[in-house]
Amino acid sequence: MTSWQRLCWHYRLWTLGCYMLLAILALKLSLRLKCDFDAMDLDSEEFQSQYCRDLLYKTLKLPAKSSINCSGVIRGEQKAVTQALLNNLEIKKKQQLFTEADYLRMTADCEHFKTKRKFIQVPLSKEEASFPIAYSMVVHEKIENFERLLRAVYTPQNVYCVHMDQKSSEPFKQAVRAIVSCFPNVFIASKLVSVVYASWSRVQADLNCMEDLLQSPVPWKYLLNTCGTDFPIKTNAEMVKALKLLKGQNSMESEVPPPHKKSRWKYHYEVTDTLHMTSKRKTPPPNNLTMFTGNAYMVASRDFIEHVFSNSKARQLIEWVKDTYSPDEHLWATLQRASWMPGSDPLHRKFDLSDMRAIARLTKWYDHEGDIENGAPYTSCSGIHQRAVCVYGSGDLHWILQNHHLLANKFDPKVDDNVLQCLEEYLRHKAIYGTEL
């Protein structure tokens, strides 16, 4: 073999070696970049890869309705907030929300609906998969609000009971049923009631869902209850961590009632289309219970919910409050201070928990808004007020996200869709990347 032939032979071997090395590197890279979305765990080494997270986020990123600076709105930058508020004024005139007919059409193909509407269809971590949450969702109108709320809290390991007001419109009920039918872990409450504002029926709607959820095969740990104007301000992963920290305790507003609220259970109330106070005085609470006041929303352990149905003293209190005014605002608060209820707090006033200290729901009340430097708990609402409660605007989002609550109330895309869009973007980005926008 001549020196030229030997040189050519060595060159071929070198080239072949280079190709083999490149092939091995390509194989290793492809294995590293393989993202198993069916057995996903964002805490695993595989999903520490920026490639996998980017791919997942691209798949689940929600389409923006408006070109606003959500990062700036979330940080509370005045220029971004002002632009979002002005943009909201412009789009409100021509805004078209999805109708019941739209949802009937979209859900004709469930897989397409879930993919197009960007529902998260796999648990994002092993920790979340092993800690399912139950939701009691009471709704009566505004179908897009319901679907966006469901999408925001939905994961396949959780379980969701939806109570529709029996007097809701037929198109609304059909659309809710159509949406629910697309998910194996979402169902309609087995018993529906007509809900009258501030009456017992609001509690009964939740109780119907609670009873159904206790029959579910899903081994949920905690229950959260929602209404149609709620929205989460924490990701599911953050909720799981917060619930684990409770270690079996509940978290809900429960305080000594001010004098003006005591009349709510001193007199018998009658229900027609609305609630009417009579002159008939009620007997004292059963079992010499001390009454407390709070709100309709709770973060309650499974043990607590089970005792609502099985404990005779709890059942007696439930019967007693049925003819009171807004029983949802004192039933749960009082049970939370009963020593025989799991996860409850002691009676002493030092254990009072305000709505700002509980994690169940963040709400801005009109009569508490003002200048923080002068002692107000929060600044003025940037949206509008409904029954003295702030319907949030874009200017509220920075404040909202500084708080420890799991959900906030009230949101309405008809009032300000941009605050919802930015909150949705924030939650989806944080769910995938673990960081803010």
Swiss-Prot record:
Glycosylation sites: N288
Keyword Acyltransferase: no
Stated family: Belongs to the glycosyltransferase 14 family.
Its biological purpose: Glycosyltransferase that can synthesize all known mucin beta 6 N-acetylglucosaminides. Mediates core 2 and core 4 O-glycan branching, 2 important steps in mucin-type biosynthesis. Also has I-branching enzyme activity by converting linear into branched poly-N-acetyllactosaminoglycans, leading to introduce the blood group I antigen during embryonic development.
PANTHER family named among the record's database cross-references: BETA-1,3-GALACTOSYL-O-GLYCOSYL-GLYCOPROTEIN BETA-1,6-N-ACETYLGLUCOSAMINYLTRANSFERASE 3 (PTHR19297:SF81), GLYCOSYLTRANSFERASE 14 FAMILY MEMBER (PTHR19297)
Organism: Mus musculus
Gene for this chain: Gcnt3
Keyword Transmembrane: yes
GO molecular function: acetylgalactosaminyl-O-glycosyl-glycoprotein beta-1,6-N-acetylglucosaminyltransferase activity; acetylglucosaminyltransferase activity; beta-1,3-galactosyl-O-glycosyl-glycoprotein beta-1,6-N-acetylglucosaminyltransferase activity; N-acetyllactosaminide beta-1,6-N-acetylglucosaminyltransferase activity
Catalysed reactions, as listed in the record: a 3-O-[beta-D-galactosyl-(1->3)-N-acetyl-alpha-D-galactosaminyl]-L-seryl-[protein] + UDP-N-acetyl-alpha-D-glucosamine = 3-O-{beta-D-galactosyl-(1->3)-[N-acetyl-beta-D-glucosaminyl-(1->6)]-N-acetyl-alpha-D-galactosaminyl}-L-seryl-[protein] + UDP + H(+); a 3-O-[beta-D-galactosyl-(1->3)-N-acetyl-alpha-D-galactosaminyl]-L-threonyl-[protein] + UDP-N-acetyl-alpha-D-glucosamine = a 3-O-{beta-D-galactosyl-(1->3)-[N-acetyl-beta-D-glucosaminyl-(1->6)]-N-acetyl-alpha-D-galactosaminyl}-L-threonyl-[protein] + UDP + H(+); a beta-D-Gal-(1->4)-beta-D-GlcNAc-(1->3)-beta-D-Gal-(1->4)-beta-D-GlcNAc derivative + UDP-N-acetyl-alpha-D-glucosamine = a beta-D-Gal-(1->4)-beta-D-GlcNAc-(1->3)-[beta-D-GlcNAc-(1->6)]-beta-D-Gal-(1->4)-N-acetyl-beta-D-glucosaminyl derivative + UDP + H(+); 3-O-[N-acetyl-beta-D-glucosaminyl-(1->3)-N-acetyl-alpha-D-galactosaminyl]-L-seryl-[protein] + UDP-N-acetyl-alpha-D-glucosamine = 3-O-[N-acetyl-beta-D-glucosaminyl-(1->3)-[N-acetyl-beta-D-glucosaminyl-(1->6)]-N-acetyl-alpha-D-galactosaminyl]-L-seryl-[protein] + UDP + H(+)
Reported modifications of this chain: N-glycosylated.
Disulfide bonds: C70-C227, C161-C381, C182-C209, C390-C422
Pfam families in the cross-refs: Branch
Membrane topology: Single-pass type II membrane protein
Top EC class, one word: transferase
Record-given protein name: Beta-1,3-galactosyl-O-glycosyl-glycoprotein beta-1,6-N-acetylglucosaminyltransferase 3
This protein's pathway: Protein modification; protein glycosylation
Localization of this protein: Golgi apparatus membrane
Swiss-Prot/TrEMBL keywords: Disulfide bond, Glycoprotein, Glycosyltransferase, Golgi apparatus, Membrane, Signal-anchor, Transferase, Transmembrane, Transmembrane helix
Topological domains, Cytoplasmic: 1-12
